[in-house]
């Protein structure tokens, strides 16, 4: 590649961790200043370079080229070419991603948290400056429970629906509208966008309001929200468009790209199919990968990218299909997960391989090679350890019970046994914290391992599930476990009856350590976090010049220290000797000065190694969520993760390669909580086949709110976030805007309530009588007319809310009124129905039987939407109410009270339905959910037999339960 090919704009790119952006202007790459990062114009194309430095010190590169929806084809093509040039500057080892506006990858969006907001215009059409811009009210849809995708939609009622979350950004206030069927986690993420808009465009001073879809007990915020849309009226169903088409994942299909043609490759996918002289296309449906052999030429790589574009066009794939190009040796986890296994090579491809010409060229241009060269050794850091001074208790499994270890033996762990270790400590000013571990010796029998797990679960349950539970295997002990013992010594043999029986059955020699036996103990630790000693074979070949050893022979004990051993190791060896044989006098033997007695005890002098033991590969931590797709266990990586990515309804895996943490949210289903270790083992098996994760890696179960320091060290942890209660939306609302946005107190005094009710009735009469003689308007007419009528109606609804909500807590709610069109008549009927509801509810309420007012819930099932129908009888009732609207309102309400109460009692009853579905289809978290049903009445679609099987009672008995108790049962069985 000649010097002319490399764009000067890329000089110095990728020299330090961070984000660099270039915009394509007149077919040239122009750097974007950091102050403009995150601002993308729809008419332009951008190149984004993300440079990260792993724990080993090497640099990793991701190049994204972002294509705005209004950009020209020529600019998009220029970006693709420039991406190849930038990759050449970086040594040809970057992962490349194509990003389409509105369908960006999670990884790309993770660089610009909480979101990007594409702006109109571009280089060709000109940019609007801040001074030129007049504040414009904007309506957005907000999608995604992890990476947020924000899209501006027309500011009109027709844009709203029951399934999505919307943000209305006005000059004075920002509203978040939660569709009745919207996802709790999407609501929570939308709050982050609201805060971002408030800080960025309102200088952090505007008000924020949360409006829940379908709530008649509206407050002034909701009233003001609907006024902006011309007044309250039913909203329609969601209408799908091209942007909503999500490509389906399909079984991966591999093609070899040769001379621009794609040849399918049959058979099970394996790493051995990929040749380093060729390019391949892996079609996974929702994502297309281009795999590039590390010795392919630049022209071949360009041709492969072009072939992928032609393939997408010929297959008529949705715009949301992602295209990612990976280079051999730097494959992403998502790419490797499509193969049955991905055996680890002897080494990562050499950084120098195939780079001679490129390196020389870069040197001519003054571009350094920092991050490409091999990294320098990393100094060992002491990881976070648990607070010292706690209470340590240890038991070993003996048969079906646990036997406590005497205090003087705590720290001696036998390879043939299993142990339970409970450490109780204080962290700051909090109450007791617990670290409960099972330790499995290499020679322990399966029965003892199962017993240890059972006993640990029993202990955890007795402590109300608060302990951090760990399963730790001999030889893979983590620092925080080793640090509990001062010192820790792993000895041969075992004390348990199970081990003794297994030795007898196999007729094997029992090598159990005793103070009188001949034993050689290796001491290699240097600090409190690795002060572990291990009994090894009593032969001279076990020695190592970089370590210390204790040789026990009868009443004598030698301390042998290699020429390369440290003073810290010598001190630790002395401590271990005192632990094993208190009061023993040590005989020192330095390497090269050993006595004949020493060699005799070892069985004779032999050669031994003088090489330092290699340490495990240091890896960066990765966070994953998981799902079962068609019965197959799959994980999805969360990039640039933070504490806020841990959603309380989910389970996550934090993989550091040395340990695996399974984090369990408070709102996870109880059944899933019981299988956490089994799910974690599935992840370990998967990561073992793809990333070489050791099958005996330590694994922990960590419940939300009980995170230990050795977990939180991987996050910028805020303890206040961890103690907030509620679902994801409630937690986020409390943290960002205070608890008043989640828990509302609407209590009113008696006299004040009478006055407010009178004012509400007057407002209602005024709002409706003023327009009773006018013909019904269409939705568009109401949007175009003056806001006087809608404002009156909004004020009336707000007055009703203030007057009645504080005292209208009843055990049941009336059915949702049937929509009768978008005319003013339907609006009047809804308001009259609302008035009747609150009057009846107040009359029914008594201090003894009224349930405590719940906090304003973000669960759609807590609030009945306005637009759902019940039956034809209700429609006729609405017509009757409309006919009486010229009369005095309170008598009308009184006349309907008896009928309203009857309906209220029947609301929660399960209505007969022609269609029934299975329980698995109706569950809220179903993998194969049913569509086209009333999601607030999922239980109504169960057959009589399956209803009894799930709830344990008949439908009639269920109907007679109070509404709150029905809701509890529905939540319990995931039908809420």
From Swiss-Prot:
GO terms for molecular function: actin filament binding; mRNA binding. Residues 908-917 have a biased composition (Polar residues). Residues 782-794 have a biased composition (Basic and acidic residues). Gelsolin-like repeats lie at residues 27-77, 148-188, 260-302, 399-450, 531-571, 633-674. Residues 911-976 form the HP domain. Belongs to the villin/gelsolin family. This is Villin-2. It comes from Arabidopsis thaliana. The lineage of its organism: Eukaryota, Viridiplantae, Streptophyta, Embryophyta, Tracheophyta. The gene is VLN2.
């Amino acid at each position: 590649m000649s010097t002319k090919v490399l764009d000067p704009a890329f000089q110095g790119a990728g020299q330090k961790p961070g984000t660099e952006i270039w915009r394509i202007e007149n077919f040239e790459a122009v750097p974007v200043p950091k102050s403009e990062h995150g601002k993308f114009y729809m008419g332009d194309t951008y190149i984004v370079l993300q440079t990260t430095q792993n724990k080993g010190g090497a640099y990793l590169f991701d190049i994204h080229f972002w294509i705005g929806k209004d950009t020209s084809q020529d600019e998009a093509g220029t970006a693709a070419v420039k991406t190849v040039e930038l990759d050449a500057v970086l040594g040809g080892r970057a992962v490349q991603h194509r990003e389409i506006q509105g369908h960006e990858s999670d990884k790309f969006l993770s660089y610009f948290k909480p979101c990007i907001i594409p702006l109109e215009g571009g280089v060709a059409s000109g940019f609007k400056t801040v001074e030129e811009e007049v504040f414009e009210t904007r309506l957005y849809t907000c999608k995604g429970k992890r990476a947020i995708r924000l899209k501006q939609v027309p500011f009109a009622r027709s844009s709203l629906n029951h399934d999505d979350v919307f943000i209305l950004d006005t000059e004075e206030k920002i509203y978040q509208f939660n569709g009745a069927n919207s996802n709790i986690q999407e609501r929570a993420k939308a709050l982050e966008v609201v805060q971002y808009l408030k800080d960025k465009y309102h200088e952090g001073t505007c008000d924020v309001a949360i409006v829940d879809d379908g709530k008649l007990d509206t407050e002034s915020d909701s009233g003001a929200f609907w006024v902006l849309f011309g007044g309250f009226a039913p909203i329609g169903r969601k209408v799908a468009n091209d942007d909503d088409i999500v490509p389906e994942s399909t079984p991966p299909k591999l093609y070899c790209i040769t001379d621009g043609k794609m040849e399918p490759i049959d058979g099970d996918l394996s790493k051995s199919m990929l040749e380093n002289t060729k390019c391949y296309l892996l079609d996974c449906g929702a994502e297309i990968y281009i795999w590039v052999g590390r010795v392919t030429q630049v022209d071949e790589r360009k041709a492969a990218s072009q072939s992928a574009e032609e393939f997408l066009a010929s297959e008529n794939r949705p715009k949301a299909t992602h295209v990612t190009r990976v280079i051999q040796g730097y494959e992403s986890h998502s790419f490797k997960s499509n193969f049955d296994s991905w055996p680890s090579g002897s080494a990562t491809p050499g950084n120098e391989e195939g780079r001679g010409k490129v390196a020389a060229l870069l040197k001519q241009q003054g571009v350094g090679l920092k991050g490409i060269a091999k990294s320098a050794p990393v100094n060992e850091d002491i990881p976070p350890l648990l607070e010292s001074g706690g209470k340590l208790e240890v038991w070993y499994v003996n048969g079906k019970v646990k036997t406590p270890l005497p205090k003087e033996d705590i720290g001696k762990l036998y390879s043939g046994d299993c142990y339970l270790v409970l450490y109780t400590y204080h962290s700051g000013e909090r109450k007791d914290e617990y670290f409960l571990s099972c330790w499995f010796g290499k020679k322990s029998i399966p029965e003892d391992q199962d017993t240890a797990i059972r006993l640990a679960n029993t202990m955890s349950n007795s402590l109300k599930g608060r302990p951090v539970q760990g399963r730790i295997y001999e030889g893979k002990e983590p620092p925080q476990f080793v640090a509990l013992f001062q010192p820790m010594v792993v000895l041969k043999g075992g004390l348990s009856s199970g081990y003794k029986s297994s030795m007898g059955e196999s007729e094997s020699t029992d090598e159990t350590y005793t103070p009188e036996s001949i034993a050689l103990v290796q001491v290699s630790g240097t600090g409190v976090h690795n002060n572990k000693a291990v009994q090894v074979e009593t032969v001279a070949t076990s020695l190592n010049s970089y370590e210390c050893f204790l040789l026990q022979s009868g009443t004598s004990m030698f301390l042998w220290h290699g020429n390369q051993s440290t003073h810290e190791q010598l001190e630790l060896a002395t401590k271990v000797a005192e632990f094993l044989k208190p009061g023993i006098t040590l005989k020192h033997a330095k390497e090269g000065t050993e006595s004949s007695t020493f060699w005799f005890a070892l069985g004779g002098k032999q050669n031994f190694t003088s090489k330092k033991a290699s340490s495990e590969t240091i890896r960066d931590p990765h966070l994953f969520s998981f799902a079962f797709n068609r019965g197959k266990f799959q994980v999805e990586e969360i990039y640039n993760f933070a504490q806020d990515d841990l959603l309380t309804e989910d389970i996550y895996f934090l993989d550091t390669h040395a340990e695996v943490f399974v984090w369990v949210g408070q709102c996870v289903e109880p059944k899933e909580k019981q299988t956490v270790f089994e799910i974690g083992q599935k992840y370990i098996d998967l990561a073992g086949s793809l990333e070489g994760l050791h099958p005996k890696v330590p694994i922990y179960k960590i419940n939300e709110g009980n995170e230990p320091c050795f977990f939180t060290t991987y996050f910028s942890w805020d303890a206040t976030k961890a103690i907030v209660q509620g679902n994801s939306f409630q937690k986020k609302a409390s943290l960002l805007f205070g608890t008043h946005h989640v828990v509302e107190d609407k209590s009113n005094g008696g006299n004040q309530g009478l006055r407010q009710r009178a004012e509400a009735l007057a407002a209602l009469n005024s709002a409706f009588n003023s327009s009773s003689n006018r013909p019904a308007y269409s939705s568009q007419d109401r949007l175009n007319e003056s806001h006087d009528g809608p404002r009156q109606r909004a004020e009336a609804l707000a007055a009703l809310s203030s007057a009645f909500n504080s005292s209208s807590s009843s055990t049941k709610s009336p059915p949702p009124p049937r929509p009768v069109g978008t005319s003013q008549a339907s609006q009047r009927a809804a308001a009259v129905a609302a008035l009747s509801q609150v009057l009846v509810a107040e009359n029914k309420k008594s201090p003894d039987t009224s349930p405590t007012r719940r906090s304003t819930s973000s669960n759609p099932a807590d609030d009945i939407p306005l637009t759902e129908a019940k039956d034809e009888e209700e429609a006729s009732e609405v017509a009757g109410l409309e006919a009486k609207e010229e009369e005095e309102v309170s008598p009308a309400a009184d006349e309907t009270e008896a009928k309203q109460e009857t309906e209220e009692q029947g609301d929660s009853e399960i209505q007969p339905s022609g269609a029934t579905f299975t329980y698995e289809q109706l569950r809220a978290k179903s993998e194969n959910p049913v569509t086209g049903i009333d999601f607030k009445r999922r239980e109504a679609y169960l057959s009589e037999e399956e209803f009894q099987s799930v709830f344990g009672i008949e439908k009639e008995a269920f109907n007679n339960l109070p509404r709150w108790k029905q809701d509890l049962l529905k939540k319990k069985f995931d039908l809420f």
